[in-house]
Each structure stands twice: as structure tokens, then as C-alpha cells.
């Protein structure tokens, strides 16, 4: 069985790491490179960096920090933010990232997934999906341009249909960002992730809701995800990654110590 992955997420805005709640009211957490280094030293399996306003600002992720991160960490990392072309992706991979993640640009042009996976291989291509559960309609909806509250759109896609679509186009991995749970630290959305797992045949990463160690054990055991992504619990030092991994081992979760 493949080891489950613990993945700190660093949302980047104006060159600094920030964190919001339900994709709003972002506060500055700190500088990119020292945080990346700290998480690598604590035992993170990989890191994900989201330049959260790149797509809504119609620009590509700022590459200057990508190479600085590559110099100081020896674990895989993934970069997202406004990647719309093969050249955008190539530059980020050349700067040292192991994977690129696309979200809003894939919704605007789904064939981008095909082109990127054919050029770089599916192992490099991660699709981020921002999923919102509408309590009134009972529907799971995919949102676009979520880095900017004023620009955010509800797309035509049902979350689970979009999961199927991106896989058919060459997604090598899917990160499901559950917007309702983001930053509130009350646990992952096990129900939605279980439904996603049923239609997802590539690695599935849970994102949104981690608040305590038991939440990680629950999402691995109940939703059978391949990785758990979290931000605020690590940024605010509520949970230490080394201690989390030791705990998961006691819960019979396959993990790299």
C-alpha cells in the first residue's frame, strides 16, 4: 500500500504566505522560503504553493520565489496560479517545481489538461477543484476565480462530473478544495470526499477543514484519500507534522516517518 501524504499548503499573495477563512479575509502568515524550509524539516511529504490571485488578476505565478524554494527543500513541490499555456508550465518546472496545478484555467479551456499531460506526462499535472456545497439546492458546484471574492464565479460543472472530465483529459492527481470547510478547522468533508473517491481513479488529495490530528486519521481511513492538505493548523503551529505522523502511525495509517 502506498504511504499517505501530508501536504502543507502555502497560499501566496503579493510575495507572502497568507491564510483566509472560506477563501476570504486573508491575513499574512510569513515569508515563503523560511516556511517551506520549516515544513520540509518537520517531515512534510510535499508542499503545494497557490498564487491565489494570479488567475483572477490574469497573470502567471511569480516565478522568482519558485527557484528560491527549490534551492532550500529536498521534497517534491507543486505550484499553481494562472498557468494557461505549455510555456507557463515549462518555466515553472524549469525553475524547480515537480508538478504544476491548474484550476481556473482548466475550467476556461479544458483542452489545456490534454495538452499539458501530453507534453509533460500525467505525473506532473495536478487539477485543483474548488467545490462548494449549496445547502439550498443540495448540489456540489465547482467555483472559478476563487482567489478574488469579487471575481468568483459558479461554473456549470457539478463537482463529481468535473472530476470525471479532468481524469478523461489526463489529470494525474486531483486536489479537492472543499470551500465550505476552508480554514474553519472542524474536520474534512468526509461525505463529499467519499463521493469523490468513488469516481476518482487517480490520487485524490483532501483539502479544507483540518483542525486536529484526529481529522487526518478520519479522512485517510473513512474517505481513503491519498493525501491530506492543510494550511492554518501548520501555519499557526497548532499541529507539528512530525508529531502528526507519529500519531497517524498509532492509528494504523500507512505513513512515512
UniProtKB/Swiss-Prot annotation:
Metabolic or biological pathway: Amino-acid biosynthesis; L-histidine biosynthesis; L-histidine from 5-phospho-alpha-D-ribose 1-diphosphate: step 5/9
Stored SUPFAM superfamilies: Ribulose-phoshate binding barrel
Compartment list: Cytoplasm
Catalysed reaction equations from the record: 5-[(5-phospho-1-deoxy-D-ribulos-1-ylimino)methylamino]-1-(5-phospho-beta-D-ribosyl)imidazole-4-carboxamide + L-glutamine = D-erythro-1-(imidazol-4-yl)glycerol 3-phosphate + 5-amino-1-(5-phospho-beta-D-ribosyl)imidazole-4-carboxamide + L-glutamate + H(+)
Active-site positions on this chain: 11, 130
Pfam families: His_biosynth
InterPro entries: Aldolase_TIM (IPR013785), His_biosynth (IPR006062), HisF (IPR004651), IGPS_HisA/HisF (IPR050064), RibuloseP-bd_barrel (IPR011060)
Assembly: Heterodimer of HisH and HisF.
Function: IGPS catalyzes the conversion of PRFAR and glutamine to IGP, AICAR and glutamate. The HisF subunit catalyzes the cyclization activity that produces IGP and AICAR from PRFAR using the ammonia provided by the HisH subunit.
Protein name: Imidazole glycerol phosphate synthase subunit HisF
Organism: Psychromonas ingrahamii (strain DSM 17664 / CCUG 51855 / 37)
The gene coding this protein: hisF
Amino acid at each position: 500500500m502506498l504511504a499517505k501524504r501530508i501536504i502543507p499548503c502555502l497560499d501566496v499573495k503579493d510575495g507572502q504566505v497568507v491564510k483566509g477563512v472560506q477563501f476570504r479575509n486573508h491575513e499574512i502568515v510569513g515569508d515563503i522560503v523560511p516556511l517551506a524550509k520549516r515544513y520540509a524539516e518537520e517531515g512534510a511529504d510535499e508542499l503545494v504553493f497557490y498564487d491565489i490571485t494570479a488567475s483572477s488578476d490574469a497573470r502567471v505565478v511569480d516565478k522568482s520565489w519558485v527557484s528560491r524554494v527549490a534551492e532550500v527543500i529536498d521534497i517534491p513541490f507543486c505550484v499553481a496560479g494562472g498557468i494557461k499555456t505549455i510555456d507557463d508550465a515549462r518555466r515553472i518546472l524549469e525553475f524547480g517545481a515537480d508538478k504544476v496545478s491548474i484550476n481556473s484555467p482548466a475550467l476556461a479551456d479544458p483542452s489545456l489538461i490534454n495538452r499539458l499531460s501530453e507534453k509533460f506526462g500525467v505525473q506532473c499535472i495536478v487539477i485543483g477543484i474548488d467545490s462548494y456545497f449549496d445547502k439550498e439546492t443540495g448540489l456540489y458546484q465547482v467555483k472559478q476565480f476563487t482567489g478574488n471574492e469579487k471575481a468568483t464565479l459558479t461554473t456549470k460543472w457539478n463537482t463529481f462530473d468535473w472530476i470525471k472530465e479532468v481524469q478523461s483529459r489526463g489529470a494525474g492527481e486531483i486536489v479537492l478544495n472543499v470551500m465550505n470547510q476552508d480554514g474553519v478547522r472542524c474536520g474534512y468533508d468526509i461525505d463529499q470526499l467519499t463521493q469523490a473517491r468513488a469516481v476518482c481513479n487517480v490520487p485524490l488529495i483532501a483539502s479544507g477543514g483540518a483542525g486536529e490530528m484526529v481529522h487526518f486519521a478520519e479522512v485517510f481511513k473513512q474517505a481513503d484519500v491519498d493525501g491530506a492538505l492543510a494550511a492554518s493548523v501548520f501555519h499557526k503551529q497548532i499541529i507539528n507534522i512530525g508529531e502528526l505522523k507519529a500519531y497517524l502511525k498509532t492509528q494504523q495509517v500507512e505513513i512515512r516517518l
